[in-house]
């Protein structure tokens, strides 16, 4: 998945703008929406943008993405559960997914690792893995859905994020939980608070009955079965409760921030 390049279209040729927007847009659903006949007038109505000579396809994509985020957030039902499956349905082998090879995944020493918790919380501190392992944990067998079009079913065990947020005295009126990861390029991702408080959103420490493998995000990933895979950050090293939208690795490249599955 490559980075979106800037594209300015002099004179705003309508067919060219829609063609380039279709090619640049990463989400297949939105790509089909534009390719299926969305006119510039419709896009202007939806995004609130006035298409002018200086308007770029990239800017149009940002506005459509912002609109989509708002719609998805509005219709999100915090009480609706992602489907669960029997353990017999687990995908074997469960695929590794990343923008780098598995041998280049972060190799973290769990004895030295700590989860830094900061932002709008009463209890700002760094949690050791041993401390986190002592928290109550639950298992879920849910489907991981990748933005690239494939899916796989896995078994994940960990602490519900909403329970941890309550434990640290997080201000759950805040807009986001923002996660920083140990990936080579400094992967990070925001999670809207409604999704963070969903009962299935989990701080994951195990895959199956084993400690979370390196390939799947050791020592901790955030499992969000109601969202696409890139919204499930791995190798998490810090969590911040905030009202500020700080962007994210893929979000900054044009992917929807909400990205419900």
Segments (PLM) and residue ranges:
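Feature targets compositionally biased, intrinsically disordered low-complexity regions
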Residues: 1, 10, 35-36, 47, ...
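N-terminal secretory signal peptides
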Residues: 1-28, 39-42
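Short, aromatic- and cysteine-enriched interfacial helices/patches
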Residues: 4, 8, 46, 51-55
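Structured, non-membrane catalytic/scaffold regions adjacent to prosthetic-group chemistry
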Residues: 17, 51-261
């Amino acid at each position: 998945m490559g980075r979106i390049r800037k594209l300015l279209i002099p004179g705003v040729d309508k067919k060219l703008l829609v063609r380039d927007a279709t090619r640049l847009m990463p989400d297949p659903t939105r790509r089909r929406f534009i390719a299926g006949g969305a006119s510039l007038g419709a896009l202007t109505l939806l995004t609130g943008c006035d298409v002018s000579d200086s308007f770029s396809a990239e800017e149009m994509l940002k506005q459509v993405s912002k609109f989509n985020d708002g719609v998805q957030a509005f219709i999100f039902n915090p009480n609706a559960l992602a489907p669960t499956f029997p353990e017999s349905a687990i995908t074997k082998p469960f695929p590794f997914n990343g923008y780098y090879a598995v041998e280049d995944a972060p190799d973290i020493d769990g004895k030295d690792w700590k989860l830094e918790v900061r932002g709008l919380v009463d209890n700002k501190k760094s949690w050791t893995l041993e401390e986190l392992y002592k928290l109550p944990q639950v298992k879920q067998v849910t489907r991981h859905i990748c933005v690239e079009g494939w899916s796989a079913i896995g078994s994940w065990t960990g602490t519900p994020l909403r329970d941890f947020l309550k434990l640290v005295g997080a201000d759950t009126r805040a807009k986001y939980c923002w996660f920083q990861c140990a990936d080579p390029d400094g992967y990070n991702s925001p999670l809207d608070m409604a999704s963070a408080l969903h009962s299935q959103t989990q701080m994951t420490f195990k895959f199956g009955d084993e400690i979370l493998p390196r390939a799947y995000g050791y020592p901790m990933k955030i499992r969000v079965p109601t969202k696409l895979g890139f919204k499930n950050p791995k190798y998490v090293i810090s969590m911040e409760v905030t009202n500020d939208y700080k962007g994210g690795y893929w979000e900054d490249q044009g992917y929807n921030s909400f990205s419900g599955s």
